Amino acid sequence: MVSGMICKAVVLVFGILYPAYNSYKAVRTKNVKEYVRWMMYWIVFALYTVTETIADLTVSWFPLYFELKIAFVVWLLSPYTRGASLLYRKFLHPLLSSKEKEIDDYIVQAKEKGYETMVNFGKQGLNLAANAAVTAAVKSQGAITERLRSFSMHDLTDVQGDETAETRFFPDGQKKPRASVSDSSGFSSLRKDSGDDRTDEDVEVNSEDEVYSQKGLRRSQSMRSVKVIKGRKEIRYGSLKHKPKKRPQLYF
């Protein structure tokens, strides 16, 4: 019994490689007789290949099936039997000559329908690709929107948490005091000096009012008020020194 692998190897070597080499020699030498011979062989072998494919699926279980295949290929190639030339001249050539016009029409229709089918498949493929791209874009946009929404809700939660903590530390609604720009080094010293000046002026006015209202005070009290007036701080405006006018001293 011959296995299927051995049959395939024999058909490959003697049915394809050997005829292909002889066809090359016929084309190179421009021998018309050999050229026609091998062209008839390839036509018959093409029909054999189609028949073999169908037979392998249906009658490969038949006894001596692979041996019959090898014998048929050898019969086609043998220069004594010339099986390929016999089959072509007796069967294939008359059949193809009678059906040539119909076969040509079928080939033209197949080309046109095949072209239209390919165009339709191409359009459908483009439409499917466009729909898939749009669907993917919409889904990605929805995912991005949900992500941004989750981020915004998280930020609002953080802000509410900060307000809760601030309310916890300042229950009366008082916010944490912040140092303003005006409380820097230069402005704070000027503000402090002006506060001292206003205090001295107020002391001066109050002391004078006390002097004029209470005439029966002792001399020591009047001297104390005069010392307060004399000890007033001088106000500076830039590089100039402002000296307040001295009031006449009152003695009792």
UniProtKB/Swiss-Prot annotation:
Residues 163-225 are annotated as: Disordered. It is found in: Endoplasmic reticulum membrane. GO terms for molecular function: microtubule binding. InterPro entries: TB2_DP1_HVA22 (IPR004345). Its main location: endoplasmic reticulum. Pfam families: TB2_DP1_HVA22. Residues 198-211 have a biased composition (Acidic residues). The chain crosses the membrane at residues 1-21, 35-55, 57-77. It is a multi-pass membrane protein. GO terms for biological process: cell division; endoplasmic reticulum tubular network organization; mitotic nuclear membrane reassembly; nuclear envelope organization. Belongs to the DP1 family. This is Receptor expression-enhancing protein 3-B. It comes from Xenopus laevis (African clawed frog).
